[in-house]
Structure formats: C-alpha cells, structure tokens
Curated annotation (Swiss-Prot):
Family: Belongs to the UbiC family.
Catalytic activity: chorismate = 4-hydroxybenzoate + pyruvate
PANTHER family in alphabetical order: CHORISMATE PYRUVATE-LYASE
UniProt-listed Enzyme Commission number(s): 4.1.3.40
Protein name: Probable chorismate pyruvate-lyase
Organism: Chromohalobacter salexigens (strain ATCC BAA-138 / DSM 3043 / CIP 106854 / NCIMB 13768 / 1H11)
Length: 183
C-alpha cells in the first residue's frame, strides 16, 4: 500500500525532490550527511543535552517497516528523544531498528546521550539516502506535536549488521533561535 492512499501516513520524498520547496537556509540542516549532534553544538553556545522520551520494543509504523524492509507486525527497538540547546528543544528524533543485529550495538545503554555520539564514531558507518517530509506533525510523535517545525528528515544507517532508521524533526524553537524561515 502506498502512503498516498492514507493521508495520515507520513509521505517521505527523496531530499532532492523537496529542495524546490525548501528555503536555502534549511537545506544545509536537512540535507547534511554528517552528525546533526555536532552541527547543533556548533550552532549555539548553549549547553547541548538529550531528553529521553521513550525507549523499548514496539511495532514499527507502516512507513518505518517498509523503509527497513520488515513485515509490519515485526517487533523493533525504538527510541524517541528531544535534542536540546539550553532549555529549548530543537530536534525531536525517533530511531527504529530491527531486533536482530542489535547485540553488541550498545543502543539500549545510550540513556541521555545522543545516538549520533555513538554512530559517528563507528569506522564502518554507512548512511543511506536522505528523505525529507514537509509536514512532520503527521508522524505521530505526540510529545512535541505542538512545536513542530517545517521539516523532518530520515535515513537508514548501518553499522555492521545493525540497521537503524533515524528520523529527525526540526522544531519551531530551532527555527526561531536561528532565525530560519518557515519553509
């Protein structure tokens, strides 16, 4: 089934397809292939922190299962966090990974540390294509829905046998603090 048939499902597009809709100010944030954590730390003098919202085993959303090549009813590890600068939440992130291949990955022990702080230290890290979404409030992450900014992005990252779908949603506070436009 295609997400087009169900308007409540997220509709992710390749990053290049979203570029005409995106302000040049947002492009470096949404299209960057390096560590978002590192970029956030550079962008603000305020202290960086991670607020863990939830972590555990669940079933993926249909679009997540499709991106990971899994049956929809499969159980996955998931983690939702807010990336904060000072007291402001700049990014909401949701990561999903198949349970097989997780042993030794240390994902469950990250706690209040960013996933990027582990991922981007791995010498065998591979990042797949980046996809973007214009209306990230449709993704079902209720903890920050009222603070949604204009863009979200996701990509599949691999470290050995571990596959992780990382989804990052830029929030209104980030746009306001960096004087970024609404698109």
């Amino acid at each position: 089934m295609s997400p087009d048939r169900f308007p409540g499902w997220p509709h992710w597009l390749p990053i290049a397809a979203q570029r005409p809709r995106m302000s040049p100010d947002w492009w470096p944030w949404v299209a960057s292939r390096d560590s978002l954590t590192a970029r956030l730390r550079i962008a603000s003098p305020r202290p960086f922190s991670v607020r863990l919202l939830t972590q555990g085993v669940t079933r993926p959303r249909l679009d997540e299962a499709q991106a990971l090549g899994l049956p929809h009813r499969t159980h996955v590890w998931h983690r939702e966090v807010l990336l904060r600068l000072g007291n402001a939440s700049w990014v909401a992130a949701r990561s999903v990974a198949p349970l097989e291949g997780l042993s030794g990955a240390r994902l469950c022990t990250l706690g209040e540390r960013s996933l990027g702080s582990w991922l981007f230290r791995q010498p065998n890290l591979e990042r797949g294509p980046i996809e973007a979404i214009r209306a990230p409030a449709m993704t079902g992450l209720d903890a920050w829905r009222g603070d949604a900014g204009p863009w979200g992005r996701r990509s599949l990252l691999r470290v050995g046998r571990t596959r992780i779908l990382v989804q990052e949603f830029f929030l209104a506070a980030m746009a306001a603090d960096l004087s970024l436009p609404s698109r």
